[in-house]
Regions:
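Short histidine-centered catalytic/ligand-binding loop motif
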Residues: 104-106, 156, 166
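DNA target-recognition domains and sequence-specific DNA-contacting regions of bacterial/archaeal
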Residues: 25-148, 196-213
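Short small-residue beta-strand/loop micro-motif enriched in glycine and branched aliphatics
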Residues: 100, 154-155
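Non-catalytic DNA-recognition/assembly elements of restriction-modification systems
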Residues: 1-8, 12, 16-62, 150-154, ...
Length: 213
């Protein structure tokens, strides 16, 4: 839903009260054409080889997504990640601190992550002229986009944040249930997990009717 609202407001230009706004050459009054480099900084990740990782609570991110965990976060809070090598232009939004390795950039910006996430995903970062595929920062910074007014960005970010919070909650619940299954199923199969004393209630459709004798 958050992506569809982004497209509706900032691509199709059907944002709230758009019918009352004057458009000049396709740009709404009060909006600005900006270079990406004017609103954010792409910062290099840091090499972290497998042998140097200490398993922990923080995800390690490469351009293909999560590639492991570590006990320390290079970036202490939520932020955005952009693929630099390999899966060029991939965009991730971790739900906690994280460790970006040297195949990605992490983003610094004053704009809300909820808005930037879909803005970055809409960008074409592929450089077809490069001998080795990769995302050049200067090339990325030169991408043009139309920057909405701050109140509209804030309004959208509130919508996006709430949608992502629901998604993150469901993801954490699924991870918890999966860990419980992986922990308890082998014990159940081997007979080490006693179920005889559990108060298991079956639905009526699963209960066989009692036979009269």
């Amino acid at each position: 839903m958050a992506e569809e609202i982004y497209r509706e407001w900032f691509v199709r230009m059907r944002f709230p009260a758009h019918e009352k706004v004057k458009f000049v050459k396709g740009v709404p009054d009060g909006w600005e054409i900006k270079k990406l480099g004017a609103v954010l900084e792409l910062c290099h990740g840091k090499a972290l080889k497998d042998r140097d990782r200490v398993p922990g609570e923080f995800h390690v991110y490469g351009s293909s997504g999560v590639v492991g965990t570590h006990n320390k976060a290079m970036v202490k809070s939520r932020g955005l990640i952009v693929g630099r090598k390999g899966n060029v232009g991939s965009v991730y939004w971790p739900d906690r601190g994280f460790f970006p390795i040297d195949t990605v950039y992490f983003v610094k910006s004053e704009l809300p992550n909820g808005f930037l996430y879909f803005l970055l995903r809409s960008m074409n970062f592929i450089n077809n002229d490069a001998a080795v595929p990769g995302l050049n920062r200067n090339q990325a910074y030169s991408n043009l986009f139309i920057l909405p007014p701050a109140p509209l960005i804030k309004k959208y970010a509130e919508v996006a944040d709430s949608q992502f919070e629901i998604k993150r909650f469901l993801t954490r619940q699924n991870e918890y249930l999966t860990s419980m299954r992986d922990r308890d199923l082998p014990r159940l199969i081997s007979g080490k997990f006693a179920v005889v004393y559990l108060d298991i209630q079956f639905p009526p459709s699963m209960v066989e009717p009692a036979h009269e004798t």
